[in-house]
Amino acid sequence: MEDYIIDFLIKFQKLIAKNVKIQHLGIENVKRICGTDIAYKGNIGYAVAVKEEEGKIEYNLVKGDVFFPYIPTFLFVREAPLMIKAVEKYECDLILVDGHGLTHPRKSGIATVIGVLLDKPTIGVAKSRLTGDLVVENNITYVILHGEKLGVKVGKYFFSIGNKTDLSDVIDLAKKGYPKVLKLADKLSKDLKKKE
């Protein structure tokens, strides 16, 4: 990848990070929760958004070409366009994104990028740690980056602030385990990929 493209993407991520709003949402107030994930077959991406409202499940599948290679810390370029297209169909009080939020070297993981671009509350839920130190306090494993608590690890999952949420929201969500809407989005995206 050309240096000037990487430089441009870093500038974009820094701008996203400057526009993050950390504010309390209140998980108990969330009536419409959405989750988004993506699977790949070659250069084709299969993104799914799952919405749950009062026990009713809806989902939207979006398929498209993926033009950008996988480069760690720049996942958003590859995945966010299709994820946004999938999730934009729904009005969501909270969007859960398969990936990191502020627990990213430039505080600009895919959950943060999607949250800022859509001006929506987001939380990132990732299956591996990208950056930050793990510190246990009062039986909670925090992910700390530059002295700031930005997420938590529960089981094998890493939950982090995306946008328009705060650490207490992240903790409250994480206590419920791996979110159902993300489980479904993961399954549906993989099922769609297999059918093609």
From Swiss-Prot:
The keyword DNA repair applies. Mg(2+) binds at residues 37, 98. It is an enzyme of class 3 (hydrolase). It comes from the Archaea. GO terms for biological process: DNA repair. Keywords: Cytoplasm, DNA damage, DNA repair, Endonuclease, Hydrolase, Magnesium, Metal-binding, Nuclease. Pfam families: Endonuclease_5. One of its GO terms (molecular function) is RNA endonuclease activity, producing 5'-phosphomonoesters. Its main location: cytoplasm. It is found in: Cytoplasm. GO terms for cellular component: cytoplasm. Signal peptide: none annotated. Its EC number is 3.1.21.7. Its cofactor is Mg(2+). CDD domains: Endonuclease_V. DNA repair enzyme involved in the repair of deaminated bases. Selectively cleaves double-stranded DNA at the second phosphodiester bond 3' to a deoxyinosine leaving behind the intact lesion on the nicked DNA. Belongs to the endonuclease V family. This is Endonuclease V. The lineage of its organism: Archaea, Thermoproteota, Thermoprotei, Sulfolobales, Sulfolobaceae.
